[in-house]
């Protein structure tokens, strides 16, 4: 369908933008990140400030632990455009955490919690990881317990990870 849109409406930038964005998402879901990133790059050539693509691209790079500087720059644009978007705050905070900046990441997660972050198992898990890294174990466990209650397979291996973190706290 996306290729058809690109054939039919090559000069309609809003349609081609959505087509490349959708193709990027589909390729990512199929596990072909190389093609996903190429599709996202094409979308960003049409609109370099398209926050949906910027966030997904940045998040997927962060999950792979790749190109964190690029991911940071893309994610920064998203929180500047939508400072109360819990998903974008999560991506930005997670990238900071992966860069070894847990203390800098914490306020972004606190803010995300005010704007829907408590509805997301992923965001609560990420926040708990940040708190754990900062040795705020009790609060980390509060968020992990909330995440465990809501987890419906969204975060694979969460229960085992929380058990391991509890063991690490006892040492």
PLM region descriptions:
Residues 25, 59-60, 94, 129:
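Residue-level recognition of tetratricopeptide repeat
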């Amino acid at each position: 369908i996306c290729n058809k849109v690109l054939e039919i409406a090559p000069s309609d930038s809003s349609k081609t933008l959505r087509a490349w964005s959708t193709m990027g998402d589909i390729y990512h879901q199929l596990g072909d990140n190389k093609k996903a990133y190429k599709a996202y790059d094409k979308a960003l050539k049409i609109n370099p400030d398209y926050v949906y693509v910027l966030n997904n691209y940045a998040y997927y790079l962060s999950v792979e632990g790749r190109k964190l500087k690029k991911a940071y720059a893309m994610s920064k644009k998203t929180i500047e455009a939508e400072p109360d978007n819990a998903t974008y705050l999560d991506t930005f905070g997670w990238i900071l955490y992966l860069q070894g900046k847990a203390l800098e990441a914490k306020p972004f997660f606190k803010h995300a919690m005010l704007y829907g972050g408590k509805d997301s198992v992923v965001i609560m898990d990420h926040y708990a990881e940040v708190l754990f890294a900062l040795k705020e174990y009790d609060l980390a466990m509060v968020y992990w317990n909330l995440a465990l209650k809501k987890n419906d397979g969204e975060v694979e291996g969460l229960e085992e990870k929380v058990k391991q973190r509890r063991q690490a706290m006892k040492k």
